[in-house]
């Protein structure tokens, strides 16, 4: 592992104050945005939404000194939906909830109306947290738009969200 820019080293006083970096993963070159932790048995998995991309990385963080990317949930075909963004994820009650929408022009270099799937996808983590099973996909009715961005799911029957919808 090369030393990340924020880690304390001989040539760097460190970026994180009052914390110590104990492990690092470049997530196989995929950026991450919101993350959510899931514990099952003795294993810990971190699900990482992508600010620009059609997937959610699954990282085994059971040993925090050696985080390992063990899978990815692809929410749509990146060859079709090249403007896809999956920035927000939530985990509770053995469910992974993923927000889908289009990227932002000034951040991602896409144009309004570029193809992106929309809505929320709900996955079951209980059977196999490395290969989540898609349970449902709620569509906003406005594909290629902003879709769902911030939302809250703490378990139970309801997801609370703002969405561009019809």
Task: Specify the residue positions occupied by each region the protein language model found.
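Feature marking well-ordered beta-strand scaffolds used for ligand recognition
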Residues: 1-166
């Amino acid at each position: 592992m090369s030393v990340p820019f924020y880690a304390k080293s001989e040539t760097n006083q460190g970026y994180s104050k009052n914390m110590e970096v104990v492990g690092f993963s470049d997530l196989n070159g995929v950026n991450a945005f919101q993350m959510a932790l899931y514990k099952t048995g003795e294993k810990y998995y971190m699900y990482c939404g992508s600010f620009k991309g059609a997937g959610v990385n699954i990282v085994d963080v059971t040993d925090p000194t050696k985080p390992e990317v063990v899978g990815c949930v692809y929410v749509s075909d990146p060859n079709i939906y090249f403007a896809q963004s999956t920035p927000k994820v939530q985990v509770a009650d053995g469910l992974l909830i993923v927000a889908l929408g289009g990227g932002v022009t000034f951040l991602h270099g896409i144009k309004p109306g570029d193809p992106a799937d929309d809505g929320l996808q709900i996955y079951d983590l209980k059977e196999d947290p490395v290969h989540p099973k898609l349970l449902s996909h709620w569509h906003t009715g406005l594909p290629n738009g902003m879709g769902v961005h911030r939302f809250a799911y703490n378990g139970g029957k309801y997801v609370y969200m703002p969405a561009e919808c019809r």
